From Swiss-Prot:
GO terms for molecular function: aminopeptidase activity; epoxide hydrolase activity; metallopeptidase activity; zinc ion binding. Aminopeptidase that preferentially cleaves di- and tripeptides. Also has low epoxide hydrolase activity (in vitro). Can hydrolyze the epoxide leukotriene LTA(4) but it forms preferentially 5,6-dihydroxy-7,9,11,14-eicosatetraenoic acid rather than the cytokine leukotriene B(4) as the product compared to the homologous mammalian enzyme (in vitro). The active site is at E300 (proton acceptor), Y401 (proton donor). Zn(2+) binds at H299, H303, E322. This is Leucine aminopeptidase 2. Binds 1 zinc ion per subunit. It catalyses: an epoxide + H2O = an ethanediol. It comes from Debaryomyces hansenii (strain ATCC 36239 / CBS 767 / BCRC 21394 / JCM 1990 / NBRC 0083 / IGC 2968) (Yeast).
Length: 641
């Protein structure tokens, strides 16, 4: 019955139109894009030209409309001839200023559109960093972040995941450059060239420039960073990268992008990782010196298929990128765990790999529950409605990741488990390779694959309406294997019992005995679960203030996940004020990281449990060091805009 509801919601044509683009991308086919740019660190701009090879899909197309945001348009040429017949339409937030270019009536086949442009100081895709603020302090630094709708502030484009193109990229800079393509040899000093033969959308165009050095981390992988931190980066990733690729290839199909490299960016990078093709951009918080955060690289690798080869047609269907990627990431992590267990002679290695996958899913489920509690309900559905002019950055959360994963996990279980579901994985990615799709097409291909295998009734039984458009938690609560989580839960229960007993004798707790054998994710689960349980029970601040002396490991940890969870536990329930060292240290830490996963909850924590004035003054102190995207989102969180 709910499938009938879905069919009534279907657009007349799939994939449906992207409401976050001002462009008329549906009217054109792009066979190639040439991006030729120069970086000025003095002026803090990128300038140059973009050349498109375009074919109108209908003969009566009279204009082309591209997305721009805070760009300066210098000159336009059509088939080499200058054109003044264009208009930069008045800006409309948050989608920028459409660039409308009239086409000559003589154009009836493929044509070339060339646009000279320059970014401005309002560009939201770029962050320039003074050399004094870099780790090495030897050169300034520049990096881009175009997802979701920020490519339009870097160059005029069809800024939507709904259309793709191969790219040739050329950049001139006084410092080494990386872009989201395969490097090409060039004899020009200070000029760097890249080729991306696989069609990609605009949000995957990436640029970085600075004092970059590199080191091998596998036969198909290189890590780049500032020279000063290179050896730490190499150690963090060299053990796992090739293993990740091989497990992923066994699950899906051969890696098509040739190289899977990574760039560890300065601390202001606002995300954990960004899956730019051939060169994943990653936060330095991954360099935890215990390899515990390397799973983020498994996630970014999975994007090489989910997101980069097969792409959501618009940000309303973002779960198709991220839900699939989390699903593949956990299969990769489980596969690695099984292989390691087998190498140690474990008889039930495959089962252990599944336990690892389920443990990761439990941690993810907890983050989903937390997200549902704090988000605007309209952003907790699997498919968003952004048709009223909503900024996709406002909708960003763990929902598409974790609700999307749980939807796929539920479908996997519904059709009979891994053995039945696994053949669908390569089928899906081959069918939509190089294309963009919506959720309706995903449902269609599920039936296309499983109906001939006698599974149509299983799919019919799915609450499609509840899963796809329902707000809050999904309609079906997953059943995960709790084996690796039980140890964490037992310690949580012990603390809750102690808190309820009103005892002051803490001798029953000991760091080595309690948490000494925990793996990094178990630390995170323990801290988050303890925070949740203490939130339901009025724990005394005296107990909270004893925790640092019992578990000094947490205070000393360099793992961002642990540090964030630990400080939430202390500050929420410890009744600390602005002068307490716990609060001061946490506030200073917020100034050293730019990853929004930590920064945004951090300021919300200070605002709610210390003081709004202190949160704002701390943010003001560090505001200039944050990326434009992060800066805007924190301002919204603190009601500053």
């Amino acid at each position: 019955m709910t499938l009938e509801y879905i069919n009534k919601k279907r657009p007349s044509v799939s994939p449906e139109l992207d409401p976050c683009s001002n462009s008329n991308y549906k009217d054109f086919q792009v066979s190639n894009t040439e991006l030729d740019i120069s970086v000025s660190f003095d002026k803090k701009i990128v300038s140059g030209q973009v050349t498109y090879k375009l074919t109108a899909k209908t003969p009566n197309t009279t204009s082309i409309v591209l997305d721009t945001s805070y760009l300066k348009i210098i000159k336009i040429r059509i088939n080499g001839l200058p054109s003044d017949n264009y208009e930069l339409v008045k800006r409309k937030e948050p989608f920028g200023s459409p660039l409308k270019i009239s086409l000559p009536t003589t154009i009836n086949k493929e044509f070339e559109l060339n646009i000279e442009f320059s970014t401005t100081d309002k560009c939201t895709a770029l962050q320039f960093i003074e050399k004094e603020a870099t780790d090495g302090q030897t050169a300034p630094y520049l990096f881009s972040q175009c997802q979701a709708i920020h490519a339009r502030s870097l160059f005029p484009c069809f800024d939507t995941p709904g259309i793709k193109s191969p790219y040739n990229m050329k950049v001139k800079s006084p410092y080494a450059c990386l872009m989201s393509g395969r490097p090409k040899e060039t004899n020009e000093e200070g000029v760097y060239c890249f080729h991306q033969p696989i069609p990609i959308p605009s949000y995957l165009v990436a640029l970085a420039s600075g004092d970059l050095a590199s080191a091998p981390i596998g036969p198909r992988s290189t890590v780049y960073s500032e020279r000063v931190g290179l050896s730490d980066c190499q150690w963090e990733f060299e053990k796992d990268m090739e293993n990740f690729i091989q497990v992923a290839e066994g699950l899906i199909f051969k890696y098509e992008w040739l190289k899977f490299d990574a760039l560890i960016l300065p601390s202001s990078f606002p995300y954990g990782g960004m899956e730019n093709p051939n060169i994943t951009f990653a936060t330095p918080t991954l360099i935890s010196k215990d390899r515990s955060q390397v799973k983020v690289m498994a996630h970014e690798l999975a994007h090489s298929w989910s997101g980069n080869l097969v792409t959501n047609c618009s940000w309303e269907h973002f779960w198709l990128n991220e839900g699939w990627t989390v699903y593949l990431e956990r299969r990769i992590i489980g596969g690695i765990a099984a292989a390691e267990a087998k190498s140690l002679g474990e008889k039930e290695a495959a089962q252990y790999g599944e336990k690892r996958r389920h443990f990761s899913a439990i941690v993810g489920w907890n983050s989903l529950v937390d997200s549902v509690k704090t988000l605007d309900p309209k952003y907790t559905s699997l498919v968003w409605n952004l048709k009223e002019g909503s900024d996709p950055d406002d909708a960003f959360s763990r929902i598409p990741y974790e609700k999307g994963f749980n939807f796929l996990f539920y479908i996997e279980q519904q059709v009979g488990g891994i053995k039945e579901f696994d053949p669908f994985i390569p089928y899906y990615f081959k069918k939509f390779r190089y294309e963009s799709l919506d959720t309706y097409q995903f449902i269609d291909v599920l039936y296309e694959f499983f109906e001939p295998r006698g599974k149509a009734a299983k799919l019919d039984a799915i609450d499609w309406k509840g899963w796809i458009f329902g707000e809050g938690l999904p309609p079906n609560i997953p059943q995960f294997d709790p084996s690796l989580a039980d140890e964490c839960y037992r310690l949580v229960d012990k603390w809750v019992d102690f808190a309820k007993s009103n005892s002051t004798d803490i001798s029953g707790f000991n760091e080595s005995r309690d948490i000494g054998n925990f793996e990094p994710d178990q630390h995170k689960l323990f801290l988050e679960s303890l925070t949740e349980k203490f939130g339901a029970y009025s724990v005394s601040e005296q107990i909270i203030r004893k925790l640092p002396s019992i578990y000094p490991f947490y205070a000393a940890s360099t793992n961002g996940e642990i540090k964030s969870s630990w400080n939430e536990l202390l500050i929420r329930f410890g009744n600390y004020n602005t002068t307490d060292q716990i609060v001061q240290d946490f506030a200073m830490w917020l100034g050293t990281v730019g990853r929004m996963k930590f920064v945004r909850p951090g300021y919300k924590l200070l605002q709610a449990y210390v003081s709004k004035e202190f949160a704002i003054s701390t943010f003001t102190k560090f505001e200039s060091s944050y990326h434009p995207i992060c800066k805007t989102m924190v301002k919204k969180d603190l009601s500053l805009i």
